[in-house]
Swiss-Prot record:
Signal peptide: none annotated. The keyword Cytoplasm applies. Homotrimer. This is Acyl-[acyl-carrier-protein]--UDP-N-acetylglucosamine O-acyltransferase. It catalyses: a (3R)-hydroxyacyl-[ACP] + UDP-N-acetyl-alpha-D-glucosamine = a UDP-3-O-[(3R)-3-hydroxyacyl]-N-acetyl-alpha-D-glucosamine + holo-[ACP]. Involved in the biosynthesis of lipid A, a phosphorylated glycolipid that anchors the lipopolysaccharide to the outer membrane of the cell. Pathway: Glycolipid biosynthesis; lipid IV(A) biosynthesis; lipid IV(A) from (3R)-3-hydroxytetradecanoyl-[acyl-carrier-protein] and UDP-N-acetyl-alpha-D-glucosamine: step 1/6. One of its GO terms (molecular function) is acyl-[acyl-carrier-protein]-UDP-N-acetylglucosamine O-acyltransferase activity.
Amino acid sequence: MSTIAESARIHPMAVVEDGATVGEGVKIGPFCHVGPHVVLQENVELLSHAIVTGRTVIGKGTRIFPMAVVGGDPQSVHHAGEETTLSVGANCTIREGVTMNTGTADFGGQTIVGDNNLFLANSHVAHDCRVGNHVIMSNNVMLAGHVVIEDRVILGGGSAVHQFTRVGRQAFVGGLSAVSYDVIPYGMLNGNPGLLSGLNVVGMTRAGIDRAVIHRVRRAYKAIFEGTASVRENAAAIREEYADCPEVVQILDFIAADSDRALSSPTRGQKG
């Protein structure tokens, strides 16, 4: 049996399958389809023709627009029908034609999307991705499987992110870019192949980061990518000098972390 709150408003032409949970204040428009294992938390809104399926939880206040398909099976040849999940956080906006897939059993079975994110038309979140908070994915952005997008990242229209790649906090990826390697926090990447073109100074300024701090991050960036040793060695060499600067420490920790991908750099040669 479905659990449907009294204050939920469900259009008579919508389909809510037995077993679904529909919270207080939820609005479900005409021709929507809600699967039997779906949980719609308070004040979720599904506009006409939206589909939420699979073992999917949609957080409070999230809006899903027409023709979006949220919670579909992972697009993986290894998926054999296992019960995997998708979790979408609160106050997200999921625009027309967006697709989000559940995880795969071999990698924990979870795709996780955070709060206050904006997914523009026809963008795609593949299986096992981790998307943070306050992320903007512009039209036609594609995340392959196992991608990690940290908080406050902006991905320009038509950009594509290779599987297992990480994009660090508050990085900016330009439109139509191919992201094949990890992008450091606060980095700005453009092109195909994607290369670092400096720091996301505009984003840092908008976030209220002090100009003196931005200057220090720029100095650290130059030391990391223009030094004579490898990127990782250069980063390790400046750690003590910048221990009092959280923004630089984030970059250094990101570089030092284990990853399946190399690091994006300002040149075609990867020194990571």
